[in-house]
């Protein structure tokens, strides 16, 4: 009976992230998804859209000020017969490794594209990351209530640029001010759009069949004729939906709508809950772990400091891979070889936290962390496993950080180490001096770090330029030659936040010369946590 219950709970789970270019409408669609999941009563509109209500999923001060999602938050809600775990990822111009790592914790992704602009740079980068694990992708063409590009052109661009086949499930009826709704190809019905219903769930009118006279009455002769022609073309020229190809990450079902107008979002949720995979198996260094295994396993993919300034706490986000978490259970923290009892794990509703009752494979739970948990840590019910594929990426931008008040050096170091463990930034301490160098994937991370040091650690810090162009983690199996390398290159060596030896290069030329000069040393662009 317990096994049956475990299976039934796991089969309900759908764990996905939303990926998009900034301003494609990701935070808005997150809101509307939560509205349909009854997780919120009324959707907040992102700041900058003429509203003083801040979006539910943007809860750090800096996010509230700027109207962007800086950290990943996790939201769980029921939808029809499924239980959905939605991981929200940063949607701003620069994003951090946090985003990459979040994508290791999901089983599918919803890609949001601004239908007026098509495929943009950030979407390309995020798709490359999903490709590493052949993640199934559902596509939502957003902002159809504005003037959009030709829908066939959009499908063609996604197929060409992102190397994924498209299978349209819905098709837009008109666009911009003339947007009338979508035709649901699978259900063979028109779903009509009403404006001014963005904050609540609409009672939509549906009309069955493309030749139904009611459709002509509703949208007019010309648009009905245009729709018939377009559908004939699109059904003839595009791919049919194929579940196997979708699960293999080779084909994406495509939906059209407007998140701001709260239209078409339920179609996406229907598709995700119907077709997206239940919790998938994960690789460890020794074997594959399957969701239905009775014993609990999970890995930490993110650490968030001070989610609640009242508590000054840190939460480790853990993806459960197999089995079941129940309050007070004992588990093995594999890296430190210690048995721990977890009685106060939490579940999330973007900043609102509740103590977790039972949680199952696919769920994300939060563990209170007093400095002992790191990104990539594995927890099990006894077995010594380490989940693989949770990466650190070499930063691309560097700054020296220094204090306005030199007496706060201890607090600065503490803050930087905590922020680096959380994945907000990387910290490097050169072997030859007391500098603190901060490395990031995107410029905004620097602003985030200074703002958080001030707000959470009461440290007033500023940046200076530093002669570092790139960094690589270094290692070697040849102890003697590695010692020789360390002696000769000491001025280019630093320790990162986890005390791993790193080569910091003033230029690409310098890095390439060192790689040639020391063939027995491995210079790594990524490091497994």
UniProtKB/Swiss-Prot annotation:
Keywords, sorted A to Z: Cytoplasm, GTP-binding, Nucleotide-binding, Protein biosynthesis
Primary localization: cytoplasm
Subcellular location: Cytoplasm
Keyword Zinc applies: no
Residues in tr-type G domain copies: 11-280
Chain ranges passing through the membrane: none
A GO term, aspect molecular function: GTP binding
GO biological process: regulation of translational termination
HAMAP family: Rel_fac_3 (MF_00072)
Role summary: Increases the formation of ribosomal termination complexes and stimulates activities of RF-1 and RF-2. It binds guanine nucleotides and has strong preference for UGA stop codons. It may interact directly with the ribosome. The stimulation of RF-1 and RF-2 is significantly reduced by GTP and GDP, but not by GMP.
Name of the molecule in the record: Peptide chain release factor 3
